[in-house]
């Protein structure tokens, strides 16, 4: 199943946002990221987790300090909210998958807070690839060849 051009751009923008955020993260931003992460990791409510996941990615986009990147990612998140919510539900049902994604978020947040731009970009790429893998699994199970990666 091929990904659309928009999906490639979104992945690149997410990676660029992580890289820029690592260079711009203030102490307040670090506290906010850790707070969102703690809420995400402690919540067992899937709807709350989906909202917190979105909040984390949105916060990274804001910290990046590039309005164009933030606005494009925010618009994409609005358009793909249903797909992401379904993907998170699928991840929660799979053994250890939620733990894997939580660990990716944790490592990403720490790279951003520590200012490691290259590591933040790499970890965001890996995170996006993981989410894409789950979206493709869902599509294969449902026999839908039109579902493509969005986040």
What are these regions (language model features)?
Residues 83-98:
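Extended hydrophobic/aromatic segments used for targeting, binding, or gating
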Residues 6, 49, 94-98:
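Alpha-helix initiation/capping motif
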Residues 76, 96-98, 147:
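Glycine-rich loops and low-complexity Gly/Arg-rich segments
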Residues 1-5, 9:
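Single conserved hydrophobic/aromatic residue that forms the stacking wall/gate
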Residues 139-151:
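Long, positively charged, glycine-interspersed low-complexity recognition regions
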């Amino acid at each position: 199943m091929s990904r659309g051009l928009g999906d490639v751009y979104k992945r690149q923008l997410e990676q660029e946002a992580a890289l820029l955020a690592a260079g711009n993260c203030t102490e307040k931003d670090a506290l906010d990221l850790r707070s969102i992460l703690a809420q995400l990791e402690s919540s067992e409510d899937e709807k709350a987790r989906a909202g917190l996941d979105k909040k984390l990615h949105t916060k990274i986009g804001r910290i990046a300090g590039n309005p164009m990147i933030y606005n494009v990612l925010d618009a994409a998140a609005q358009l793909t909210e249903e797909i992401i919510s379904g993907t998170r539900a699928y991840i929660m049902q799979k053994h250890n998958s939620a733990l894997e994604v939580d660990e990716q978020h944790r490592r990403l947040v720490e790279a951003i807070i520590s200012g490691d731009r290259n590591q933040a970009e790499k970890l965001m790429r890996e995170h996006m690839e993981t989410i894409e893998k789950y979206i493709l699994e869902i599509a294969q199970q449902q026999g839908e060849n039109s579902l493509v990666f969005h986040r």
